[in-house]
């Protein structure tokens, strides 16, 4: 984000990175998650799932975000309260969300389908049925080429 988009990085982390890392990214530590939520235009969640982070982003915390802010989650689905996020998206409490993990996966809360301000992707894009079929077909093509004394398209040396 810093180098690619020129974004100013602010963060809250219980495991503070080294001064060298903070300086490298010209980052500013905040004293709490709440402080980040109040200041950030883009909030990107990076934490493990589990009891301590369950619904870390709940209705109250989502409500602390700027009206024009975007929430990004590629960590774990249960870190965000889906119902609270859907409500915030529909009410334009925040500008939008980008998600590739969802609470209750593999099921998707159908409320997300009515949110034009949400971008939804599979966490493991290569796990889609279409992609897996294409991968299998490619293996078969490589095997066929090999057994016909031809160069496989995806030769591994």
Stretches with model-predicted labels:
Residues 1-67:
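Rossmann-like dinucleotide/phosphate-binding beta-alpha-beta segment
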């Amino acid at each position: 984000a810093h180098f690619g988009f020129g974004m100013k990085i602010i963060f809250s982390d219980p495991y503070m990175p080294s001064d060298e890392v903070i300086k490298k990214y010209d980052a500013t530590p905040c004293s709490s998650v709440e402080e980040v939520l109040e200041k950030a235009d883009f909030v990107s969640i990076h934490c493990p799932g589990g009891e301590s982070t369950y619904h870390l982003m709940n209705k109250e915390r989502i409500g602390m975000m700027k009206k024009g802010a975007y929430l990004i989650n590629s960590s774990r689905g249960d870190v965000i309260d889906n119902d609270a996020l859907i409500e915030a998206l529909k009410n334009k409490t925040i500008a939008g969300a980008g998600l590739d993990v969802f609470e209750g996966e593999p099921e998707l809360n159908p409320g997300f389908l009515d949110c034009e301000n949400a971008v939804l992707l599979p966490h493991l894009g290569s796990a889609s049925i279409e992609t897996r079929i294409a991968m299998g077909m490619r293996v078969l093509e490589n095997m066929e080429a090999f057994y016909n004394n031809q160069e496989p398209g995806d030769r591994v040396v």
